[in-house]
């Protein structure tokens, strides 16, 4: 799985850390909407 930071687009604040096999998978698992949030990272987590 990869680790992503959840960034709120309105103020570019990092608000959460989520995990997923891809960016799309991480969005599904997190429940955040891509319209309002961005995921950055993609680091491999142990």
Residue ranges and their predicted role:
Residues 1-13:
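Short aromatic-glycine-(Arg/Gly/Cys) micro-motifs in beta-strand/loop hairpins
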Residues 4, 24-25:
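General helical secondary-structure elements
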Residues 12-22, 41:
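A short, exposed loop/beta-hairpin motif centered on an aromatic-Gly-Thr core
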């Amino acid at each position: 799985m990869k680790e992503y930071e959840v960034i709120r687009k309105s103020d570019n604040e990092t608000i959460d850390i989520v995990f997923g096999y891809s960016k799309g998978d991480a969005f599904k698992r997190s429940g955040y909407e891509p319209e309002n949030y961005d995921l950055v990272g993609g680091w491999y987590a142990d």
